Amino acid sequence: MGHKIFVSYKYADSDVRRITNNWYTTDTVRTYVDKLEEYISKVSEHIYKGETDGEDLSSLSEDAIWNKLKDRIYDSTLTIVIISKGMRNRYLRDRDQWIPWEISYSLKEVSRKNISGNMVTSSSNAMLAIILPDRNGSYEYFTYNKSCCSNPCRYLKTDFLFEIMRKNMFNIKSVDSKMCNDGSTVYFGDSSYISSVKWDDFIKEPETYIDKAYDIQSKIEKYNVYKELD
């Protein structure tokens, strides 16, 4: 069964690995979103609810753009957040940037009237973060593998993220974890409401990760989900 998918991302971030053969243009996060949109719209049964490349929003005010985005998020059931090296402007507050608001709205239960005049409340969206490689092809600005324990584990630099993303990772109520040899904590199972995956892994089997996001959503009561911006 197809799902309605919204994608949240930093449009013009160009610190990404090149994936096109057109050397006269610069690949950006939007280049990856185009690939994702193509899969959602043409290969899968899903419906793409995000912004389309070439869509002219220049004549609209910020309020009008935000209302359009809210309409699309409200009508979606999964929000994919694209993690890229330049996604966050550290000189601006999180609440002055688009992505945190899109995440917050995705997680809230929002009530609206339908065409019959009845109030309909949306559920918190399933969430999935896709990590893009930087221009050097590396993911280590956010994640890398550690081998300090008997079993290799994956390290996430959550301080790199917007606060609302950081709070919704490693936020399971009943924690299954152990102390690693270097003093860090290793988590087992689906410990985060916003799970994350590298682009190269996602694109090989996207449905596996989409299904996992919905599986986690079905157990949302097991997580401390943060929906507001500080």
Regions found by a protein language model. Give the residues of each.
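Short, flexible/disordered intra-domain loops and linkers
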Residues: 14-27, 89-99, 140-147
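Conserved N-terminal substructure of TIR/SEFIR domains
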Residues: 1-78, 198-230
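C-terminal interaction surface of TIR/SEFIR-family domains
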Residues: 4, 11-17, 133-230
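Short, compact, well-ordered microdomains
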Residues: 79-85
